[in-house]
Amino acid sequence: MERKTIDLEQGWDYMQTGITKLKRILEGLNEPAFDSEQYMMLYTTIYNMCTQKPPHDYSQQLYDKYREAFEEYINSTVLPALREKHDEFMLRELFKRWSNHKVMVRWLSRFFYYLDRYFIARRSLPPLNEVGLTCFRDLVYNELHSKVKQAVIALVDKEREGEQIDRALLKNVLDIYVEIGMGQMERYEEDFESFMLQDTSSYYSRKASSWIQEDSCPDYMLKSEECLKKERERVAHYLHSSSEPKLVEKVQHELLVVFASQLLEKEHSGCRALLRDDKVDDLSRMYRLYHKILRGLEPVANIFKQHVTAEGNALVQQAEDTATNQVANTASVQEQVLIRKVIELHDKYMVYVTECFQNHTLFHKALKEAFEIFCNKTVAGSSSAELLATFCDNILKKGGSEKLSDEAIEDTLEKVVKLLAYISDKDLFAEFYRKKLARRLLFDRSANDDHERSILTKLKQQCGGQFTSKMEGMVTDLTLARENQNSFEDYLGSNPAANPGIDLTVTVLTTGFWPSYKSFDINLPSEMIKCVEVFKGFYETKTKHRKLTWIYSLGTCHINGKFDQKAIELIVSTYQAAVLLLFNTTDKLSYTEILAQLNLSHEDLVRLLHSLSCAKYKILLKEPNTKTVSQNDAFEFNSKFTDRMRRIKIPLPPVDERKKVVEDVDKDRRYAIDAAIVRIMKSRKVLGHQQLVSECVEQLSRMFKPDIKAIKKRMEDLITRDYLERDKENPNMFRYLA
């Protein structure tokens, strides 16, 4: 049976009934929903009109009429309804109309489904769904988006001022911008977001201008942090998620970047004041706010560095002033107080770096640079390297000024080693430390072997094995020396004929590890010569390949002084003992006679005689009785001497070792510079002057800050010794001579 042909007008009239019914439903009029039979009739009508033989295939006409149906509805109903409303009411109407429009598109595209499947697919035309959305875009959106944008921004600003707004409505309206873009974000970004960001900038620019005048730095930061939190909430509630970084950037720029220096430099509440008053919460907030801004932390780190430097400089100045106003004894106590205070300062600001500033490298660098400034200053002629070595000595020696528990000692040593990192003359510290370590070990002044080894381990980790190898050798030497002494005592036990009749303890040391000491060919008293010979005999039974050099200046003697009232045990140096023993054979000796008998230098003899005749314990009487020793003086044994103690120690005036240490270090530095230059040139063969100097500085600065002039001088010296030569063509180039 042949199907009856439907002409265009008749078919479209029927479709209009369905479209009208749909519009009535959308307008909320009392209209029953479509039943399946009505739906099928509408679908079939379209199907039939599209599958009739030409010229009755109305596919193209129906495709056009589909679009016209939307256009008619929008022009007659939707636009008039929207044009009469404003602000929030207009936004509500827009959302309602958009929701209805999507329903209309869904229903109509189902009625016209056959068009989508065949006609549109074959002709590559826009699909029905897209045509429906395009109608709304071209007729409604293009006319209204500017008003909509203004209404939305007005509501956002209301909310910023603390008013309650309908966030769900804003979300729904802003979703239209995204949906109209059909998968692209241009409409949202160009028609709404760019204006909203501009408004945000203006809004916060106004706020910042008044807050920066009225508020303290902490209050301003609190407000800023709150604003940023609120803006992020806005994104979560109604803006598109892609707006967050842009929005936050605008707020940060206006509140934190534009007024950064004014905020941080506020006189009574800015960054300096917060550091001065230990406002850790505010400083943490400052870090949180500024670390998200490109280079935002640099000024904060800079102020931090200046603040720490000023505090450190003040401590150094305080120690300097005290040292100037006081006697030497209390000055050295002040210097020790200084190191303790510097450690406390470091502890305090390290907590700031790790907690307030979240371990950020900029603040580690600022702290390091600040400490390097004041940790390399001298106090009353003492370098910081020496002060630090003395501080360690006070902790590690018996009866030192620092009375601490084992744990506290370990903790303090750890901190001292950290401070050493800031000191440029590490080699000078090493030399002072070695000198003091030698005294602790040789005169049995070290309080605890474990602590001695522990600090060496810490120093080794910090500065490398080369730094501590000699010191470790010294500690080991002493253990070996004790074993050696036990063997010597066993030897005497089995060779009674060899016993010198004097208790003798000898400490044998390895030359390379210990500081250099002057050794003199002093004419020893016969009692002592016997001791030396006996020990030599013992030592040769152990080894024939080692030479013993005696350092008498480090020895100690216990001698019995028989005075008129009572006998007193005198603890003296080997040299002092040698002087006193001369008086066993004669009561009176002139300076010249003593000098001839002992074969000492004038300088040493004056020190010895002064300690025995002019100081606290006058074992010898001097003629004339003056405070200084001269070459015309005569000395006699003071038999009337007495003291309430049965045993007394007669000290020698201390020799200022500082000059010698500095000289030794300077000498070592010359060798170190030579070695560095040769090492570099050996690997590079040819190198420019400037580059050689800078590589040299880089290699050496782990141990000391090499002086450029000294490097140049060493280069010249190496040229004269045929290690290097200047290039004939270019005197700024050096060649290595193998």
Swiss-Prot record:
The record's account of how the chain is modified after translation: Neddylated (rubylated). Deneddylation occurs upon interaction with the COP9 signalosome (CSN) complex.
Database matches in SUPFAM superfamilies: Cullin homology domain, Cullin repeat-like, Winged helix' DNA-binding domain
Domain (Cullin neddylation): residue spans on this chain: 668-730
A cellular component annotation (GO) from this entry: phragmoplast
Record localization: Nucleus; Cytoplasm; Cytoplasm, Cytoskeleton, Spindle; Cytoplasm, Cytoskeleton, Phragmoplast
Pathway(s): Protein modification; protein ubiquitination
Record flagged with keyword Ubl conjugation: yes
Key words of the record: Auxin signaling pathway, Cell cycle, Cytoplasm, Cytoskeleton, Developmental protein, Ethylene signaling pathway, Isopeptide bond, Nucleus, Ubl conjugation, Ubl conjugation pathway
Known tissue expression: Expressed constitutively in roots, seedlings, stems, leaves and flowers.
Biological process annotations from GO: auxin-activated signaling pathway; embryo development ending in seed dormancy; ethylene-activated signaling pathway; jasmonic acid mediated signaling pathway; leaf development; phloem or xylem histogenesis; protein ubiquitination; regulation of circadian rhythm
Covalent link Glycyl lysine isopeptide (Lys-Gly) (interchain with G-Cter in NEDD8), residues: 682
Xref: SMART domains: CULLIN, Cullin_Nedd8
MF terms in GO: ubiquitin protein ligase binding
First-listed, main subcellular location of the protein, grouped into a coarse class: nucleus
Family listed: Belongs to the cullin family.
Subunit structure: Part of E3 ubiquitin ligase SCF complexes such as SCF(TIR1) and SCF(COI1). SCF(TIR1) is composed of CUL1, SKP1 (SKP1A or SKP1B), RBX1 (RBX1A or RBX1B) and TIR1, while SCF(COI1) is composed of CUL1, SKP1, RBX1 and COI1. A SNF1-related protein kinase (KIN10 and KIN11) can also be part of these SCF complexes. SCF(TIR1) is able to interact with the COP9 signalosome (CSN) complex. Interacts directly with some F-box proteins such as DOR, SKIP14, FBW2/SKIP18, SKIP19/FBL20 and SKIP28/MEE11. Interacts with CAND1.
Function summary: Involved in ubiquitination and subsequent proteasomal degradation of target proteins. Regulator of mitotic processes which plays a role during gametogenesis and embryogenesis. Together with SKP1, RBX1 and a F-box protein, it forms a SCF complex. The functional specificity of this complex depends of the type of F-box protein. SCF(UFO) is implicated in floral organ development. SCF(TIR1) is involved in auxin signaling pathway. SCF(COI1) regulates responses to jasmonates. SCF(EID1) and SCF(AFR) are implicated in phytochrome A light signaling.
Name the UniProt record assigns to this protein: Cullin-1
Gene name tied to this protein: CUL1
